């Protein structure tokens, strides 16, 4: 077979170079609009499996099973492209390319590189037309009919003053041969025809009906002529051509030898005969395989060539992801996606495609989502972690671009510019409401000081924790005390001006208090005095130390404090002043003898914790700050008596004393405490134990106390922020272990979802887990398991399983012993084999709703605890997972407008879970059960 070639390499003669440019443009036009050759010198991926398909398509014979396999030959080879030469058959004008490849060794694959283009753009001309020949076009006695718009666009303009209008055209083919045609405009109706010279061209090229011809008018005002043969199977192979089996053996042997010796080998690529490109740029391969997630059920579109040399997108659905030939080519990405096409006319389309050929309609970025699925509890040490990964490695493994690499473990893609996307990021969505959290500042500052921490370090750490926008995990720098004092002095100057303005406003508001409110507060104070007498008896303080005059003065003092609290609730600078006051005490290194309680009481003096926007900030769980205390310290610190004070006009109860007998430090005795109370203007010093401190009301959208009619001996009467903290109760087996964060407005329990396990261990690694049998009701009280019996009965171990687009199923989870067995059974029930075990690659996620109405990722809890707490299971598609993230961001960006908390219905039904508006309900993005897919 004689060949004429034109390549990228410079030729010795100028004429040859000119021919190279022409043939290059025409070669791409004849190859097709979807063909793109990689540039010389770039890195490519070669698929021997795809090369075999080209041989099978050319010879119309599949690969025989007796052809030996090469186990050492990988299904994809990373190679360096040294040369590309474009060829065309002299007799048939069939275009093909010759490529010289050299496999890269492991060390060369690890070397960083600058990625070249995704391929040389197909040099499709802009001024051309392509027509499929009809029977009349190929007849020897007729001419070639040219569409009117095509003739006016491509051919030189005719002189319509002549009768008939006609001209002579000269066109060049791929081999630089000239062909002359007579272009005439005639007939009834009149049309453009090529007459003289056309029959000679058809006979010389042996064109038949179904073949296509292209006419191109290039930038040099030259007319080019190309041919596209119709794909017709060859019934008789020439004797000079090797047999199909020999060609298969040859290409496999050449590739295996080159891979073993890192030597060069040559391949031929026929774009018109090959079903798909089997040599693609490495950048294109990496982008499709490692940076695009696909899953079963996902919609996609794919480009196809039309008859007129244009492209069209066809829509389809992914129906499966598996190896095309798992026996001979295991772990190969070649045609690993099974698809179903929408149009009935797409029967000739391939039932399997490769990842780099399709365009998923829903793409998943590889960096962590801004609203990730969080672990509800810290994972117990010693137990297998999420999906079999170690907890320390989970953050990096989840973000690794090669996590699900099945064959190219040695690849290094640092030079591709995608590495910043892979870095684990700290999710700051849960920290938006913590920047002005005064209660957090008060508790952290006071408790750390009581533990004997250096005040300067405590202040620096606290200020950094409050003001750091990103909570850096790599290099947390300490703030110098001098810089801290300078910042605090500036803030105090600014706040002093604001306080003067607020004092004027407060005086006006205080004058507007109605007489009815004062009478109501007086009645509340009388009730409080009776409760305080019970408190003193409970604490063992003799009543002889409480003169009636002091009690009466205390009553007047509390009345004035409660009135002042109503006014201070409108003071936006109160919380900021409290933070600055505490920081100034901690930041001063010249006051080592300051009482451990002064910092806390100075903050406690502020009676309002409203933010500058007039709303209530979300707060982090208090047990995050107190988790390092022992059982005795926790129980004593939170051993508060029931105050039963009514709510003021702002919705907050009065202060309540918190007693902690364990906070006895050297040099900080009763005298220091007395001085602190005198600074606060307290006249009822003897009414409070010497080591008592006053905690402000717990900030949040939900009311913190509820009227109770029980006696003082009621074990549920010792409440802190609506939570029973009696250490003798069964609800508190270990001091602080069952202290839960109380929901804010909308019922949202604020937590800190971290993507880094190291950062997570610093703040919440020591938090004790709560029992799954306890939950928080709408009033915010922690209920015991015996009180939940009538509300959430657990009659059997059958659990409902939901999947969008499918009927719900019921499953007995008691017959399973691990998460792996459960995932396998769920995959079998819903036809998702191989998808649920690897959610990172497939995009499918399993979540469940526990009996506390929380949406959790399957695998968060140990298996026995999961069995006892699971309520229902939901299978989320990749689209639903993405909708959850969007819904979470909308909830964080929008302020809640009510205190309504949606709970599971009393009958224990989970069917309407996806339709509730609880912010914790991440299933708002889940399609309703039984609905159809919406693409």
Swiss-Prot record:
Residues 546-565, 573-582 have a biased composition (Low complexity). GO terms for molecular function: DNA binding; DNA-binding transcription factor activity. PROSITE patterns: B3 (PS50863), PB1 (PS51745). GO terms for biological process: auxin-activated signaling pathway; flower development; response to auxin. GO terms for cellular component: nucleus. InterPro entries: ARF_dom, ARF_plant, AUX/IAA_dom, B3_DNA-bd, DNA-bd_pseudobarrel_sf, PB1-like. Transmembrane segments: none annotated. It holds the Pfam family ARF_AD. Keywords: Activator, Auxin signaling pathway, DNA-binding, Nucleus, Transcription, Transcription regulation. Residues 536-624, 645-714, 896-917 are annotated as: Disordered. Induction: Repressed by miR167. Expressed in the whole plant. Residues 796-880 form the PB1 domain. It comes from the Eukaryota. Residues 583-624, 661-689, 896-909 have a biased composition (Polar residues). Residues 129-231 bind DNA. It is found in: Nucleus. Interactions between auxin response factors (ARFs) and Aux/IAA proteins occur through their C-terminal dimerization domains III and IV. Homodimers and heterodimers. Belongs to the ARF family. PANTHER family: AUXIN RESPONSE FACTOR 4-RELATED, AUXIN RESPONSE FACTOR 6. Auxin response factors (ARFs) are transcriptional factors that bind specifically to the DNA sequence 5'-TGTCTC-3' found in the auxin-responsive promoter elements (AuxREs). Seems to act as transcriptional activator. Formation of heterodimers with Aux/IAA proteins may alter their ability to modulate early auxin response genes expression. Regulates both stamen and gynoecium maturation. Promotes jasmonic acid production. Partially redundant with ARF8. This is Auxin response factor 6. It comes from Arabidopsis thaliana. The lineage of its organism: Eukaryota, Viridiplantae, Streptophyta, Embryophyta, Tracheophyta.
């Amino acid at each position: 077979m004689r060949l004429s070639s034109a390549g990228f390499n410079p030729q010795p003669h100028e004429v040859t170079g000119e021919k190279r440019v022409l043939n290059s443009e025409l070669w791409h036009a004849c190859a097709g609009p979807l063909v793109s050759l990689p540039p010389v010198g770039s890195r490519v991926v070669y698929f021997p499996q795809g090369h075999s398909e080209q041989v099978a398509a050319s010879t119309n014979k599949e690969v025989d099973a007796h052809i030996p396999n090469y186990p050492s030959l990988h299904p994809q080879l990373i190679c360096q492209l040294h040369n590309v030469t474009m060829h065309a058959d002299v007799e048939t004008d069939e275009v093909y390319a010759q490529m010289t490849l050299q496999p890269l060794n492991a060390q060369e694959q690890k070397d960083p590189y600058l990625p070249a283009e995704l391929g040389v753009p197909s040099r499709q001309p802009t001024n051309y037309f392509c027509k499929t020949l009809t029977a009349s076009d190929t007849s020897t006695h007729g001419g070639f009919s040219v569409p009117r718009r095509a003739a006016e666009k491509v051919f030189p303009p005719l002189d319509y003053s002549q009768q008939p209008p006609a001209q002579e055209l000269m066109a060049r083919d791929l081999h630089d041969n000239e062909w002359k045609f007579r272009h005439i405009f005639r007939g009834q109706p009149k049309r453009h025809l090529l007459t003289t010279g056309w029959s000679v061209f058809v006979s010389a090229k042996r064109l038949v009906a179904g073949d296509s011809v292209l006419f191109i008018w290039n930038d040099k005002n030259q007319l080019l002529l190309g041919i596209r043969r119709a794909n017709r199977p060859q019934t008789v192979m020439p004797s000079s051509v090797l047999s199909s089996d020999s060609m298969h053996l040859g290409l496999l042997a050449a590739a295996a030898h080159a891979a073993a010796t890192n030597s060069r080998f040559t391949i031929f690529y026929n774009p018109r005969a090959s079903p798909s490109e089997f040599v693609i740029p490495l950048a294109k391969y990496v982008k499709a395989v490692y940076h695009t997630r696909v899953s079963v059920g996902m919609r996609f579109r794919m480009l196809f060539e039309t008859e007129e040399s244009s492209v069209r997108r066809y829509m389809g659905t992914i129906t499966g992801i598996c190896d095309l030939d798992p026996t001979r080519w295991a772990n190969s990405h070649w045609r690993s996606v099974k698809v179903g096409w929408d149009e009935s006319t797409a029967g000739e389309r391939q039932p399997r495609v490769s990842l780099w050929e399709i365009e998923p309609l829903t793409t998943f970025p590889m960096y962590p989502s801004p609203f990730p699925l969080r672990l509800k509890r810290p994972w117990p040490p010693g137990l297998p972690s999420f999906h079999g990964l170690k907890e320390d490695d989970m953050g990096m493994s989840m973000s690794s671009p090669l996590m699900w690499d099945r064959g190219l473990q040695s690849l290094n893609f640092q030079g591709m510019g995608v590495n910043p996307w892979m870095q684990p990021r700290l999710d700051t969505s849960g920290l938006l409401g913590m920047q002005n959290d005064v209660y957090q500042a008060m508790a952290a500052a006071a408790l750390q000081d009581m533990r004997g921490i250096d005040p300067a370090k405590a202040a620096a750490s606290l200020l950094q924790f409050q003001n750091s926008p990103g909570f850096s995990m790599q290099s947390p720098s300490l703030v110098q005390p001098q810089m801290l004092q300078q910042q605090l002095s500036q803030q105090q100057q600014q706040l002093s001006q604001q306080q003067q303005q607020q004092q004027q406003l407060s005086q006006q508001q205080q004058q507007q208090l109605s007489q009815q409110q004062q009478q109501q507060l007086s009645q509340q104070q009388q009730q409080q005095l009776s409760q305080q007498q019970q408190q003193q008896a409970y604490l063992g303080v003799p009543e002889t130390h409480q003169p009636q005059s002091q009690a009466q003065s205390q009553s007047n003092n509390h009345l004035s404090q409660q009135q002042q609290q109503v006014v201070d609730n409108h003071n936006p600078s109160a919380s900021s002043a409290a933070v600055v006051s505490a920081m100034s005490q901690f930041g001063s290194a010249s006051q080592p003898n300051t009482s451990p309680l002064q910092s806390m009481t100075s903050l406690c003096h502020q009676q309002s914790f409203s933010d500058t926007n007039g709303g209530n900030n979300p707060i982090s769980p208090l047990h995050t700050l107190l988790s390092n205390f022992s059982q005795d310290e926790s129980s004593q610190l939170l051993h508060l008596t029931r105050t039963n004070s009514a709510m003021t006009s702002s919705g907050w109860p009065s202060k309540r004393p918190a007693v902690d007998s364990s906070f006895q430090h050297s040099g900080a005795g009763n005298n220091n405490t007395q001085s602190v109370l005198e600074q606060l203007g307290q006249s009822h010093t003897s009414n409070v134990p010497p080591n008592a401190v006053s905690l402000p009301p717990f900030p949040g959208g939900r009311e913190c106390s509820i009227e109770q009619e029980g006696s003082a001996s009621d074990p549920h009467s010792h409440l802190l922020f609506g939570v029973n903290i009696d250490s003798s109760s069964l609800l508190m087996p270990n001091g602080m272990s069952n202290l839960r964060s109380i929901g804010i407005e909308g019922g949202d329990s604020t937590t800190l979802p971290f993507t880094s396990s190291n950062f997570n261990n610093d703040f919440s690694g020591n938090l004790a887990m709560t029992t799954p049998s306890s939950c928080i009701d709408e009033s915010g009280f922690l209920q015991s398991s015996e009180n939940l019996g009538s509300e959430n009965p657990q009659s059997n171990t059958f659990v409902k399983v939901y999947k969008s687009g499918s009927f719900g199923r019921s499953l007995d989870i008691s017959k399973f012993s691990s998460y792996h067995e459960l995932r396998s059974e769920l995959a079998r029930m819903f036809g998702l084999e191989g998808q649920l075990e690897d959610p990172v690659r497939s995009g499918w996620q399993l979540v469940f709703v526990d009996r506390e109405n929380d949406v959790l990722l399957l695998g968060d809890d140990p298996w026995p605890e999961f069995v006892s707490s699971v309520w229902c299971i939901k299978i989320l598609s990749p689209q639903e997972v993405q909708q959850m993230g969007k819904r979470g961001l909308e909830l964080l960006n929008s302020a809640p407008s009510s205190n309504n908390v949606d709970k599971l219905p009393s009958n224990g039904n989970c069917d309407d879970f996806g339709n509730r508006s609880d912010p914790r309900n991440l299933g708002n993005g889940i399609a309703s059960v039984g609905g159809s897919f919406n693409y």
